[in-house]
Amino acid sequence: MKQLFGKFACLMLLVMACCVVAPVSAMAGTGVDNFKITSGIDTRKSSEITFDATRVISGTAEKGAKIGITVYEPYTVNGKTYYKLIRTYNITVGSTGIFSQSISLKEGANYLVVAARKDGKYSEIRTTINRKDKVLKSVLSQSIA
């Protein structure tokens, strides 16, 4: 049992070490009123890990605000990080002040920017969601069982 726990602990440390750390940040000051992510991104964390191919991001903002959710793939060349555009999702907030959008995640690092715009005001939240492959999920579930 101790040996199994030791293997599981080592595997979990490896998973955490593989995470790309990109802090969740929010632009404040002249921001869009009531802009807040309510689910799909944990704004208290700098990055998250998932095995899921999709994620639903929901939040609030003032009526008429334009929400853009952009997914980038980070990559490094000669020590400098660049971001390749993967996909952009656009939503207009309705009278309820609530928005929700399902997004696709590729395996590996997915750098997300969720931005709100209205009447010259701008707010954004940035984070990284790391999607792990099914092989790792299988190994973890076998270690736990």
Regions found by a protein language model. Name each.
Residues M1-Q3, V15-M16:
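Classical N-terminal targeting signals for secretion and organelle import
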Residues C18-S25:
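C-terminal segment of classical bacterial N-terminal signal peptides
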Residues K2-C10, A26-A145:
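Ser/Thr-rich low-complexity repeats and stalk/linker segments
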Residues A9-C18:
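Hydrophobic helical h-region of N-terminal Sec-dependent signal peptides
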